[in-house]
Amino acid sequence: MSLHEEILQYSRQDTMKPLSNWFSNLLSESIESGVYGDKNLLEETGQRLVAGIRDYGEKYNINRVAIGMSGGVDSALTAAMFKDAGWSVLGVTMPIHQNPEETDRGIAACETLGIEHKQVDLTKTYDQLLKTFQDHDSTLKDDDQKLRRGNLRVRLRMMTIYNEASRIRGLVASTDNFSELAAGFWTLHGDVGDLAPIQSLSKSWEVPRLAEMFGVPKETVFAKPTDGLGISDGDEAQFGFSYLEFDLVLLRLCQAGVLSTREDCLNFLNVPESDSDHVNKILDRIRMSTFKRTNPYNLTHPIQTNRYTGLNIIDSALW
């Protein structure tokens, strides 16, 4: 199987609408330039990230981590990397009106990877919390408020996982990948954490391929990506484009260097008219999530403008 075909398989693009000619050519160019690396490059990438986890633990004298095991490939790969780095890993499943298959995959990943598992069923807690909020805001139950209700689930899970991390005197792992970071497909003060080993990895190729290499079960590697919140029929249905399409545009733009306007982005990509609407939808997604990546936006002291720089210097000196 060629690398091109492998990427279509691991991104699940081969189960969806075929790539347009422009996207297919962009994939070929991305393979040729090394943006989509082969197995050897991925092995090196994975081992360097594991070394980074190990170095972090040695620097800050910590080696325990709690990870929310959603049943998806991101959390499973994150757990596998921490385990490979020699950390004590607690995988926590936290179902809330969950598809049982997702919870089962989270448990199976813990068993396969040989890490400790704990289940905290938050369904009743969430229902009570939702009722309390609805008593003060009846609109929360409306059909068009799924996103708000979903964010409540995520933040309830984050409270739980941080409590578990505190109990074991460890930290919380962030399981977001680079694609989700750029798309804003995460909740502020929700599904984030203290150390993010896979946040530089693409969802369409590096995450699933590395997950298989690290021993994650195949049913998890190839599971349909969902937010686990019941907001839509999978991540890509919510986006309106596939992860592979998103990553191809994102990673190509990351190579551009200086970009000043949207027009610069489109010109650099050399997007044909037939694909312009699709690419603009991707650019809109990145643009509308910028506020998440800059949160909180810290205003500079109007007189003593170097305070943040000074604090960074102090932090570096003390560590």
Residue ranges, per PLM feature:
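ATP/NTP-dependent adenylation/nucleotidyl-transfer catalytic domains that generate, transfer
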Residues: 2-67, 90, 97-98, 105-124, ...
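Phosphate- and divalent-cation-binding pockets in alpha/beta enzyme and binding domains
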Residues: 77, 128, 181
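Short, surface-exposed alpha-helical segments at coil->helix boundaries
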Residues: 75, 79, 100-107
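Conserved G/P- and acidic residue-centered "switch" motifs that form tight phosphate/ATP-binding loops
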Residues: 72
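Conserved S-adenosyl-L-methionine
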Residues: 84-89
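Short, hydrophobic alpha-helix immediately C-terminal to the catalytic nucleophile
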Residues: 76-83, 162
